[in-house]
Each structure stands twice: as structure tokens, then as C-alpha cells.
């Protein structure tokens, strides 16, 4: 079918003037929208429709607050049975329609429409004409089917004491929109450059224009049912004269980030905004080997403090790590880690992968059991093929509660009742071994 023509007179919707729009987005696929509206009402009880509503609106969250007590809202419904060709044809079963084809026009009562053909009954001759949908250029309908809507619509039943314009506030929750933080860190010898972004994903079914934007970081409890590549530089495309900046502050038990400019968040858009300016953060690289494991893990450790070059609350998100390839001075990806919501002065420990040139193996030399105890002799061999010395934390953890380490070849720290940490320095291009006996009693 090449086209659909509807001969219909539309009812005028409520005259709404939007201003001062507020959008607060949460981490858990939820957002709160608030706006001021102006209604032009007649005296008495009436129906009015509010268009441009998200398809994912949480209908039970809609709040309507008139500025004048002379307006009262009695009932509302959310209309999402949107107009399209197939639904209209189903509504017109048993009614007269007109089909326009290259061979002429066909008029009659629509008996069926299966998508491939129209069945039209000529009531004067009682003939049934079957017209192929592929031959139809236009379908002419006498009017829009009742209770059909072009867009998702809130329909209100309300009353006003007198005709006139009334101010009100409208707010609601919607699903389908969320935000996340993403970080890019370029590692140097002792510090890294941290580039932080906010990514907003809008699948709510509505464009949010010129909104005052706030982001809430933290796990907000609700009863609602249930990455795109970043540039390594500070590139940012904005229409305003200045770069938008998020202002962060504590809010209840959460953190709130307020953008200092208004923003457009369009439907089916993934929008990225800078969270913080570039930060240079001091860090240490840590190597960890779990006794019995197959590899040595690499960790990036830093403290979220001002003295350390950071000192800002960090929303949870992925941290992409890069290192500079000195042969051509370009950043190369070396790993990704997940950071949780991180408060000020909190220690951060992120695993970015396994070391290639630092190798470890565990050898169980001897095991014996007697008198409600078991002794196991371990030898840990470490090899460092790097050009510089490294320190490896060798960790032995046992689920037993009565665990002892006997005859260790080097000193160790006891992290808890059953976890022991040996810090082993391995020379560049060299090897190092440690031995100890583990005794478990019961």
C-alpha cells in the first residue's frame, strides 16, 4: 500500500506551555521528569489530553498539582493504542471504506483485511471484491476511529469552576532511561591521567528538551517492575559557549550531580557529557598470586584523596586502562576494571588482567595427616622476565578456622584468621622461591 489518507477533523488538545523542565536520572533504569504546564479550560467537567508522554511512563507515579484550587482532576488514563494502518483497518471492520488503485476505485464495507488483501462487500449487489494490498495506492476513511491516538497520551477528566488558563505542575517517573559513568585512564610510571564521562541512554519513548539535568548516584530502592568508544583526549562537542560542568554534592544517602547548563536528551540517543576535568592520580601497580593458581594478577591501587590528585566522589562504572606505546607514542588498551561507588579517601584496588612476564607455580612437596591435623609443605616459584624488579604478593587462603603457617622461608602478614600474605621481591630477569608448611587442625 503506497499511502493512507484520513478525512477527519481532529479535536484540539489542551494548550500546554512547557517551561522549567527538570529531569533527574537514576542508575537503575528510572528517571523523574517534572515540568510546569498551562491548561486552557472550559467551565465544568471536561476531558483533556496531554501528548508527548514516554511510552515507558510509570502511570501510577503521575502527579498533577494545580496552582489554583478551582481545578480538580478526577480520573486519568494512559493511551498507548497508537494509530497505524493495521489497527485502523481492524477498527474499520464492518464499516465503509474506499480503496484507490491504478485500475480505479473500490467502495464497500470492509469484511476483512489480512495484510495481503482487502475484502470489500458491495451491499447494493452483495458482491465481495477482494483487492490486493499491493495494488492499493490510498485508503480513504471517513473519520479517525474513536479513541485512537497518534502519540502516547495522558487523558484526564477534570473540572474547572470557570473558563480560563490555569497553571499546574506535572511530574512522573519513566523507565527506559539511565546513566552510567565511564573512565579512561592513561597509565604513566607513577601516575595516570583520568578522563571521566557520563553516558546517558534514553529509550523512554520521549525527547527531553531544554531540561535542568540531575544525576543520582547510589542504589535507590524502587517498587518499579522489573560502550561506545571514548576519545583519549578532552574532545567535547557542545552548542553552548562554555563546556558544561557537573556540580557534585551529597543528597540524602546518595550523591547528586547537577549540570550547570540545560541539556537535550533525545529518544533513542546515547549522549555523553564530561563528568570531571582531567585528573592526574598517583598509583601503585601490584602483582598478586593466589597459591595454586595459574597466573599472576595485575592490580592498580590508588587512594581517592585530594593529596593523591583525585579527591572527588566516583560513581560506579567501568575504568578502561591504557599505556603509551613509546615506539609511536600512541595509547594501547591494557585492561578494563569495574569500580564501585567510591567515596572520598577510600582505597581503590582494580584488577586489570594477568601478567605475561611474571610467572608463578605452586609445588606441593609433602602432605601428612595425624592426630586431627594435616600438614602440607608448599614451594612457590616466581619468575620475572621484565626489565625491572617486581614485588609479588603471594596469598594463601584456607577455609579452615584453625590454620597455622610453620617454617616460612620469609616473613608474612596474617590478613585474617585463614589468609596469609607473603611479599616476595623478584629481581629483573630472575627467579625467587619461598617455602612454608601449612597446618590445619580440627
Model-derived segments and their meaning:
Residues 3-4, 15-442:
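Long, intrinsically disordered, low-complexity accessory segments associated with secretion
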